[in-house]
């Protein structure tokens, strides 16, 4: 079981040009979903400062996952992730609330997923920021290969987590928000 996430992002992409390139290189289009997420920190919010959290994610009507994430470094493989499938989004939120870990923030994003040569390519659209693409795979070499196939320059790859990027590149204090959704950002 691989618990290290190997991923990078390319920010402020031309979505239509990227989709065209994905089709040209034969990437498999796995569709677009709205992702609903409940982000959970410890009651003292130490986890937030330590860049770790629990996430309950509902992917449209397809699946629900519970994930523990810990960002140790801002590198291609600097994230530890442990994820499992669960059945009930709302019941999971209630369970954590009952044990003293209520959800802190509700996130939403739209994700258009593709697969190419074993690499997952996610075109992510969040509220308030430009759309970006995330590549995730088994190795840095695999990501570099797919980035090259998609005409993405590796020197432009960003290895920060989404929260860091939203706060530091776009000056949106998302870690203080209770809602970061398409209907409400506060």
Name what the model sees in each region.
Residues 124-129:
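A contiguous pocket-lining binding segment that forms or flanks enzyme active sites
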Residues 1-120, 155-186:
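N-terminal strand-loop-strand beta-hairpin
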Residues 144-155:
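Long, well-ordered alpha-helical scaffolding segments within enzyme catalytic domains
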